[in-house]
Amino acid sequence: MLAKHCLEEFKLDCQLRRLTDRTIKGYYNNTLNFLIYAEKHHGITEVEEVYTLHIKHYVQYLLSKKLTAAYTNNILKCLRAYFRFAIQEEYI
């Protein structure tokens, strides 16, 4: 499944779980930024193409931007939620 289509389903799932608009926006934007990075740097468009190594490269990229640890951890929390959803829905 296209990673961006999975993201749209993830957003809908978050809305159905009645998460706040702010939380949904954060999950969506942080995950979208990762997907854009993955496509640009690794040519990844399908959710099942993402491996742990790609996420590690993304973390390394975030660290190179001198972001705070709290902000970086928040991004990782969003990615964990997205991939947990993808596994739950058996897209991965």
Regions found by a protein language model. Name each.
Residues K4, E8-K25, N29-I92:
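N-terminal core-binding DNA-recognition domain of tyrosine recombinases/integrases
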